[in-house]
Design a protein with these regions (language model features):
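Bacterial N-terminal signal peptides that target proteins for export
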Residues: 2-11
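Sec/Tat signal peptide C-region and signal peptidase I cleavage site
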Residues: 20-26
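Amphipathic, charged alpha-helical segments and their helix-to-coil junctions
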Residues: 26-181
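Bacterial N-terminal signal peptides
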Residues: 11-20
């Protein structure tokens, strides 16, 4: 009986050692890296091009909006002056036409902003679709088994964002040469 107890203890000890060895080997083979996706896009040539295009278009839209606002204010003042010299029915027609014009301009402005935001989102998505194989290859080269977004990690010793920006820039540049599908 004593022999069985002793054998059992040795068996348990050996199983524990084996399990510990397996855990140690497994933990050594798992290498996790982090990536700042926003920084990758923002700092890449592709992302810089898209952000500049969106910024330029936003400035054009703002300038157009300010110009239209100035025109509408002038037209509104003119309508206010006319109100004193024209009949009520004619004023109501002019006011309704002015209101319709304002609503149309607001609608067009909103539509232009939505279109610009959609373009920005689509280009960002396209960038990550193109960059994914590059990130996979880079992860393999660095021996990473997992790549996480930096926002999901409390501490990381292996952030590959800067390396990824360099690699993506070398492969896809600013993205103008890539034919969209």
């Amino acid at each position: 009986m004593l022999f069985l107890k002793r054998s059992y203890r040795i068996f348990i000890f050996l199983i524990s050692l084996f399990a510990y060895a397996q855990i140690s080997v497994a933990s050594e083979s798992i290498s996790i890296g982090t990536l700042d996706q926003d920084a990758l896009f923002r700092n890449s040539l592709f992302g810089k091009r898209v952000l500049q295009e969106v910024s330029d278009e936003s400035e054009l839209l703002l300038a157009k909006e300010l110009s239209l606002q100035s025109e509408l204010e002038t037209e509104e003042q003119s309508l206010t002056v006319k109100r004193k010299t024209i009949g009520t029915e004619e004023f109501i027609k002019l006011a309704a036409a002015f209101d319709e014009k304002v609503q149309k301009i607001r609608s067009e402005t909103t539509e232009a902003r939505i279109k610009l935001n959609k373009y920005s989102d689509e280009e960002r998505n396209r960038f990550f679709q193109i960059a994914l194989p590059i990130l996979v290859q880079l992860s393999e080269e660095l021996g990473l088994s997992t790549l996480l977004d930096h926002r999901m990690v409390i501490l990381s010793l292996k952030n590959i964002t800067d390396i990824a920006v360099d690699r993506v820039d070398k492969v896809i540049g600013n993205g103008r040469e890539i034919i969209s599908e």
